[in-house]
Design a protein with these regions (language model features):
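Substrate-gating cap/lid alpha-helix
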Residues: 171-205
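Oxyanion-hole/transition-state-stabilizing segment in secreted/luminal serine hydrolases
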Residues: 38, 48, 58-60, 89-93, ...
């Protein structure tokens, strides 16, 4: 009797287990969140990086996609990039003509996180971290350690962490007696390898290197970085495209430019300068509020005034998006 009962209970248990596996959504519940998931679950997204991020153009381009995709559910993007910055804590001799060493993110990170209170942090470092010298294990170790500390600090503050591999370095436009892009290959390969440790990594370096080299096969002078480092409009759009792909929208990421993206979505071009202005107002305010050691950075408005200005711009953005969506 007990044997029959035990067999019956075992059969019921197996059946329930099979049913639970077949219920839609069960597998997804155990999977890692997608880029879109991370964005829709966030109210405030902090961007950290060097001068490329500080310029803010790729952040604004990505924001233009966000506000047309998620509309009033889009998270607020706050750009706190700082020119010359590294996570390696290194600085070459005579940086900036000897006026100041490269700032180290670790010096200001806690203050930035406290000021911004982000739900999600997206960081892009590396092009400055090798200080434009040949590959060296010691410098590489400093970069690895800085990235690990950045991730740990962000997660301790309660935010999710996403990292982009560093951009392409244009050895043709800014030649050295070695390939600095090869150094960044090593940095990028290591970051991609951290995916197996649970890191969320967006690969910018690989696709950017491939795209430039393919274009140069027919246009030898082609570049998206006229000085070898800082992207032009097309370069910033390329970075934004990788973010849009990560967020799951391959179709929009294929647009040739931000204006093409807006046109395809039947959105007015006037949306883009509003998004760019909002980005600039918040960037200048929060970078100044957190404080840093780099001279020559615009102070910006006090945070409360900047937030009020950003809210005015957000209303104009919402009006444009809502009107175009009807």
């Amino acid at each position: 009797m007990n044997t029959r009962r035990n067999r019956l209970m075992m059969g019921i248990g197996i059946a329930l287990a099979l049913v639970s596996l077949s219920v839609p959504g069960r597998a997804q519940e155990r999977s890692e969140p997608t880029g879109r998931d991370l964005l829709t679950r966030s109210k405030r997204v902090l961007f950290l990086g060097d001068s490329i991020t500080a310029a803010g153009q790729y952040v604004a381009n990505f924001d233009a996609w966000l506000v047309t995709e998620l509309k009033d559910q889009a998270p607020k993007l706050i750009d706190c990039g700082l020119s010359s910055e590294t996570v390696s804590g290194l600085s070459e001799d005579g940086h900036a003509g000897g006026k100041f060493p490269r700032p180290d993110l670790a010096e200001r990170l806690d203050r930035v996180l406290k000021a911004v209170q982000p739900d999600l942090v997206i960081a892009c470092y590396g092009i400055n971290c090798g200080i434009y010298l040949p590959f060296d294990e010691s410098r590489f170790g400093k970069y690895q350690g800085g990235m690990k500390q950045l991730k740990a600090t962000v997660e301790k503050a309660g935010a999710k962490f996403v990292v982009m591999t560093p951009p392409f370095y244009d050895d043709v436009r800014a030649p050295k007696n070695f390939s600095y892009n090869d150094v960044l290959d090593r940095f990028s390969d290591w970051l991609i390898g951290q995916r197996k440790e649970g890191w969320t990594v967006i690969d910018l370096h690989g696709p950017m290197t491939k795209a430039v080299r393919e274009r140069r096969s027919t246009e030898p002078q082609f570049t998206v970085q006229p000085d070898g480092v800082h992207p032009n409009d097309a370069g910033h759009w390329f970075i934004a495209q990788q973010l849009i792909k990560w967020a799951g929208d391959e179709k929009s990421a294929a647009a040739e430019s931000p204006k093409s993206l807006l046109a395809a979505r039947q959105m007015p071009e006037s949306l883009l300068p509003l998004v760019q202005q909002r980005m600039s107002v918040l960037r200048d305010a929060y970078v100044a509020a957190a404080g840093h050691l780099r001279p020559g950075v615009a102070k910006g408005l006090p945070v409360n005034e900047a937030e009020a200005k950003a809210e005015e711009l957000s209303k104009q953005i919402t009006t444009l998006v809502s009107g175009a969506s009807k």
